[in-house]
Amino acid sequence: MIKIGIYGAKGRMGKQIEECLKSETQAQISILYDKGGNLEELFEKSDVIIDFSSPSGTHELLNYARTMPKPLVIGTTGLDEKILHLMQSASEVMPIFYATNMSLGVAVLNYLASKASQMLKNFDIEILEMHHRHKKDAPSGTAMTLAQSVAKARNLELEKVRVSGRDGIIGERSKDEIAVMSLRGGDIVGRHTVGFYEDGEFLELNHTATSRATFAKGAIKIAIWLSKQEAKMYSINDFLGI
């Protein structure tokens, strides 16, 4: 049995992973860690660690991991360039999987959106994400991943073409503009729409998550897989083989 440590165990995703691991036949919980816990114990007793914490928590985890390398599955969103660079550096001595969404359906959405962006070159692109009222970051990490993918498919630099809101008399939409909009309310687990719009027709690709168990089960499958991999950075495409 693979021993999985949950970093950020008191959060919504941490609790969901704990619940899903109770019925898992290939893995079991080693340590439930939250802020103020014993990091040394977490690393000593775990074969792999799943992180759904906060940017500051992920930063602390990566710094400690250099002293006791273990496979890390990181699903925390809102990470800045400094933390992403630290993650890349740490992957030289341990396998690290990073994704803003652990859903296999979202991975396919990302793949399809990239292909559609290439094929529908004259279509306007708009991205809409919806989440529960408690979500702290906006746009969602998944929405930004989708935006990066469709921009890259058109050889565009996202930071130069992204629009995060519209208000007042702003003029016509530019050709390369990619809007990423956020809605918050209720208990929506997650919904992402990538729309491609042209005169006379439009195509919308949608993914809706109805339960956090979707992300938790995905993270567990990835953790089991990652425990057998060599030191480097991995993405959802590596896991799926696409």
From Swiss-Prot:
The active site is at 131 (proton donor/acceptor), 135 (proton donor). GO terms for cellular component: cytosol. It is found in: Cytoplasm. Its EC number is 1.17.1.8. (S)-2,3,4,5-tetrahydrodipicolinate binds at residues 132, 141-142. The gene is dapB. One of its GO terms (molecular function) is oxidoreductase activity, acting on CH or CH2 groups, NAD or NADP as acceptor. Gene3D superfamilies: Dihydrodipicolinate Reductase, domain 2, NAD(P)-binding Rossmann-like Domain. PANTHER family: 4-HYDROXY-TETRAHYDRODIPICOLINATE REDUCTASE 1, CHLOROPLASTIC-RELATED, DIHYDRODIPICOLINATE REDUCTASE. Pathway: Amino-acid biosynthesis; L-lysine biosynthesis via DAP pathway; (S)-tetrahydrodipicolinate from L-aspartate: step 4/4. HAMAP family: DapB. The keyword Secreted does not apply. NAD(+) binds at residues 8-13, 75-77, 99-102. Keywords: Amino-acid biosynthesis, Cytoplasm, Diaminopimelate biosynthesis, Lysine biosynthesis, NAD, NADP, Oxidoreductase. It catalyses: (S)-2,3,4,5-tetrahydrodipicolinate + NAD(+) + H2O = (2S,4S)-4-hydroxy-2,3,4,5-tetrahydrodipicolinate + NADH + H(+); (S)-2,3,4,5-tetrahydrodipicolinate + NADP(+) + H2O = (2S,4S)-4-hydroxy-2,3,4,5-tetrahydrodipicolinate + NADPH + H(+). Its main location: cytoplasm. Transmembrane segments: none annotated. Belongs to the DapB family. NCBIfam families: dapB. This is 4-hydroxy-tetrahydrodipicolinate reductase.
